[in-house]
From Swiss-Prot:
Residues 1-180 are cytoplasmic. This is Cholera toxin homolog transcriptional activator. One of its GO terms (molecular function) is DNA binding. The gene is toxR. Changing P169H: In strain: AQ3815. Its main location: membrane. Changing N134I: In strain: DOH272 and AQ4901. GO terms for cellular component: plasma membrane.
Length: 292
């Protein structure tokens, strides 16, 4: 991906540093916001490929699978929602992250790569005089060649083209506007679908609450009641090792069908950098070691 030390300037406003997972807002006195690891990796991939639609599968592969995790679609939806809050972006009129229905996501703002090295600019300035010399030599070549071409063209006598009698136009029996209207409607229909169709957001239901932290799961997700004791132990262990003001606002549980469960700890916007994804396995007598 990007070189170490490289930063990105988004829409001439946010300075994104993927190495420290930070986002500085120039309109707020360079106020620095810490991103979670998931949100930072999503923004890095979008910034590397601006204006390109990234599929949900590509984002899953880079953010989770390369780290050894397998999560469902709700984890990506939640991470995109948190990232938009950090960018102060709107879902209805986005200026940064745009949802492309049935395809994925797209970074639509301007992106400028800020390299830590300034030698590139000096090398460009040195090369400019050479390009001026090349232009001058090219003009000289054109000046020499053009007269010879003109002389050659004068010497060649083109044969006269035979005169073809014009045919009277045949009156069309079909109204010429009908094909144009059909073509216009065919072009207009997909545009209307893209503009007026909003992707459905994931819906969640609560399956429990431990240490004042609600546990959520997607509405259509299979039952995972047999995992509740392990979830309770994990949350109690997590709360014990974290300060009260940085506790998660909710935990999203997914999986459970392959003897493993994924827990997404979601924090508020002030502590979003602590968002983390954990995986626990069935058959563990004491799962608390990985739930710190």
């Amino acid at each position: 991906m990007t070189n170490i030390g490289t930063k990105f300037l988004l829409a001439q406003r946010f300075t994104f540093d993927p190495n420290s997972n930070s986002l500085a807002d120039q309109q707020s006195g360079n106020e620095v916001v810490r991103l979670g690891s998931n949100e930072s990796r999503i923004l890095l991939m979008l910034a590397e490929r601006p204006n390109e639609v990234l599929t949900r599968n590509e984002l899953h592969e880079f953010v989770w699978r390369e780290q050894g995790f397998e999560v469902d679609d709700s984890s990506l939806t939640q991470a995109i929602s948190t990232l938009r809050k950090m960018l102060k972006d709107s879902t209805k009129s986005p200026e940064f992250v745009k949802t492309v229905p049935k395809r994925g996501y797209q970074l639509i703002c301007t992106v400028e790569r800020l390299s830590p090295l300034s030698s590139d600019s000096s090398s460009i300035e040195v090369e400019e005089p050479a390009s001026d010399n090349n232009d001058a030599s090219a003009n000289e070549v054109e000046t020499i060649v053009e007269p010879s071409l003109a002389t050659t063209s004068d010497a060649i006598v083109e044969p006269e083209a035979p005169v073809v009698p014009e045919k009277a136009p045949v009156a069309s029996a079909v109204n010429p506007w009908i094909p144009r209207v059909i073509l216009f409607l065919a072009l207009l229909l997909p545009i209307c679908v893209l503009l007026f169709t909003n992707p459905a957001e994931s819906q969640f239901r609560q399956i429990g609450e431990y240490q004042n932290v609600p546990v959520m799961t997607p509405v259509n997700h299979p039952q995972i009641n047999n995992w509740l004791p392990s979830i309770e132990q994990c949350i109690e262990r997590y709360v014990k090792h974290h300060a009260e003001d940085s506790l998660p606002v909710e935990v999203i549980a997914t999986g459970g069908q392959n003897n493993q469960l994924i827990l997404n700890y979601i924090h508020d916007s002030n502590h979003s950098y602590e968002n983390v994804t954990l995986r626990i396995f069935a058959g563990q007598n004491d799962p608390t070691d990985i739930c710190k």
